[in-house]
Amino acid sequence: MMGATSPSGLELTMAVPGLSSSGSEGAGCNNNNAGGGCNMRDLDINQPASGGEEEEFPMGSVEEDEEERGVGGPHRPKKLRLSKEQSRLLEESFRLNHTLTPKQKEALAIKLKLRPRQVEVWFQNRRARTKLKQTEMECEYLKRCFGSLTEENRRLQREVEELRAMRVAPPTVLSPHTRQPLPASALTMCPRCERITAATGPPAVRPPPSSAAAAAPSPFHPRRPSAAF
């Protein structure tokens, strides 16, 4: 780990393979090496720095890291330490504008005592984290929608099965005399109206009128001629 001081007074740290810093940092790395390696503390740029007055964030962009890693093998990105005041001003500027113009970038760099490139990289990292957070929220929302739609699909499938069962099964017809359901063998379908009715025997033949009824005098009495004629 090599340390350097920028013209603005900020300390820049850069990891170099095969070298380690002296003092307490070197002792900390040695202790960590005994446990499995020396790892730098990762900080969330969305949250203020905790436990200290400074915050670190990668200086280089993703493209730069890939180029340096391809040329010189494994590479650890450089870190820039920001104070709480600098982090607060950067967050306020990001809430106002997610993208800065060259003039805004230059003015903010002068105000924060940073280089314009450092401000640009910070905004790139901040936009990437915002996009990642938004993607996670959209993924969670789509998962909930998928679950509700799956449950609705199952409910509709159950309703379809119930309707099919009702369509196949014969309808229940009650007897007009006993009010009990008639068996399926006793049901017939009217060919004209296609309605299921209870099976009945042949139509009853009406008895002919009796002879007594035929011989009964008619209640109509014709008018007799008058005696005057």
Curated annotation (Swiss-Prot):
Annotated region (Disordered), positions in chain: 1-82, 198-229
DNA-binding region (UniProt annotation): 75-134
Subunit structure: Homodimer. May form a heterodimer with HOX1, HOX2 or HOX7.
Similarity field: Belongs to the HD-ZIP homeobox family. Class II subfamily.
Region (Leucine-zipper): 133-177
Tissue specificity remark: Expressed in seedlings, roots, leaves, nodes, internodes, flowers and embryo.
Gene Ontology annotations for the cellular component aspect, listed alphabetically: nucleus
Biased composition (Acidic residues): 52-68
PROSITE patterns per UniProt: HOMEOBOX_1, HOMEOBOX_2
Location within or outside the cell: Nucleus
Keywords, in A-Z order: DNA-binding, Homeobox, Nucleus, Transcription, Transcription regulation
Biological function: Probable transcription repressor that binds to the DNA sequence 5'-CAAT[GC]ATTG-3'.
First-listed, main subcellular location of the protein, grouped into a coarse class: nucleus
InterPro entries per record: HD, HD-ZIP_Homeobox_LZ_Class_II, Homeobox_CS, Homeodomain-like_sf, Leu_zip_homeo
Molecular function via GO: DNA-binding transcription factor activity, RNA polymerase II-specific; sequence-specific DNA binding
SUPFAM superfamilies, sorted: Homeodomain-like
Annotated organism of origin: Oryza sativa subsp. japonica (Rice)
The protein's name in its UniProt record: Homeobox-leucine zipper protein HOX3
CDD domains reported in the protein's UniProt record: homeodomain
